[in-house]
Structures are given as structure tokens and as C-alpha cells.
Design a protein with these regions (language model features):
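Walker A (P-loop) phosphate-binding motif
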Residues: 1
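Acidic, Mg2+-coordinating active-site environments of NTP-dependent enzymes
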Residues: 14-25, 29-31, 39-172
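Short amphipathic alpha-helices and their capping/turn segments at secondary-structure boundaries
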Residues: 29-35, 187-189
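Conserved phosphate/oxyanion-binding catalytic-loop motifs
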Residues: 175
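AMP-binding/adenylate-forming catalytic core of the ANL superfamily
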Residues: 178-192
Length: 192
């Protein structure tokens, strides 16, 4: 949505005493300055892979658009939540240091998720869940309560979805991966 619509939605939520909102900051929206006047407590950087090149034309332009949130929009002492195992982590670390942002790494929470072992979970789902948990904690939710509620979470259809399991333990999964990186992550999860 355009900037005016975003602010109308946020104002409506505020009037209805909704104090924490999660917004997907698309590279298009960042590039078009649609999110510049929003006060974010934190931002999550999940990954970076070949996508949206019809708009951005090249990977450098695409990455620069995604980094606008971290380089220009987040205010001092805001948080960046990410995975130290992604290629862009050193860039995020440098931005955090230069801008006085706090970088939250997800290794410990990933271990806790794996111990709780939720159904068939791919590595990318575990990482995304870990980042969401860290964001929820920043909104004041207690970790213990978050982990209790995980049993109620329904998977997104078509994302490493177990479609069928045969008696000989062969499993069929559906995933709508549409980028080379997403397909690779699905295949790596199946390998495990």
C-alpha cells in the first residue's frame, strides 16, 4: 500500500489499542520511500536471494533496497534480528555498529526450537520462527508463553508441507519455492 494508506491503517490500529504491529517491509516499498516515517522497534533480515529482479534489475540494487530499513529507517537503539550464518550478516553487523543498533542473533533460540521439535520443520522454517520469537519477546511476550503457544501454530500451505506419508516411511512434501535459493533450502531440508 501507499504511505497514506499505511498510516491510516496504523492510526486505526492505535485507536483500537493495538500497540504492536508487524509489517513486511518489501524492497519495493523501501525503494519507493513508503516506510520512511514509521517508527520501528526492530527489523528482521531473513535472507537475500535472487528475486524481484524485474523491478530492481540487478542484485546490488535489490540488496541496497532491502538495506534501506537498516541504514536509514531504524532509529538508534532499535534492534536487528538475523542469522549470523547468512552472507549479509557482516554487512548488518557493520550497519549496527555504525548506527548504534543492537544486533540480535538467533543461535540460542534455534537450539530451543529444535529441542521442542515441532513436527516436520525445515531449517528455514526454524530460522524464521526463531526470528519471530525474538520479535515477540521485544513486544513484551514471555518466552515460556511463546513456546507453549507454538503447538497451536498452523503451517502455511505450500511451505514444506507434508502432503502424504506412506507406510514404508516415504514422505511427500509440497513447497512452492520459486527462487534458486528457496529451492536449494527445501532440498537441503529434505536431505536431513
Amino acid at each position: 500500500p501507499d504511505t497514506i494508506s499505511i498510516h491510516k491503517y496504523l492510526q486505526f490500529l492505535k485507536k483500537n489499542e493495538i500497540n504492536n504491529v508487524i509489517i513486511e517491509a518489501s524492497s519495493h516499498g523501501l525503494d519507493q520511500d513508503r516506510l520512511h516515517h514509521i517508527n520501528f522497534k526492530a527489523a528482521i533480515f531473513t535472507n537475500f536471494s535472487q528475486d524481484h529482479l524485474d523491478y530492481h534489475k540487478n542484485m546490488t540494487s535489490y540488496l541496497n533496497a532491502k538495506l534501506i530499513l537498516f541504514k536509514k529507517i531504524l532509529k538508534k537503539n532499535s534492534r536487528i534480528i538475523s542469522d549470523k550464518n547468512i552472507n549479509e550478516y557482516p554487512v548488518l553487523k557493520k550497519i549496527a555498529k555504525n548506527r548504534g543498533l543492537n544486533l540480535i542473533e538467533i543461535v540460542k533460540i534455534i537450539k530451543k526450537i529444535k529441542i521442542t521439535s515441532l513436527n516436520e520443520m525445515s531449517e528455514f522454517k526454524i530460522k524464521n520462527l526463531a526470528m519471530a520469537i525474538e520479535a515477540a519477546k521485544l513486544c513484551g511476550l514471555k518466552e515460556k508463553k511463546i513456546f507453549k503457544s507454538l503447538k497451536k501454530i498452523k503451517d502455511v500451505d505450500g511451505r514444506f508441507e507434508l502432503a502424504r506419508q506412506f507406510s514404508n516411511n516415504i514422505k511427500v512434501f509440497i513447497d512452492y519455492a520459486h527462487t534458486p535459493d528457496a529451492l536449494l533450502k527445501v532440498l537441503q531440508s529434505l536431505e536431513r
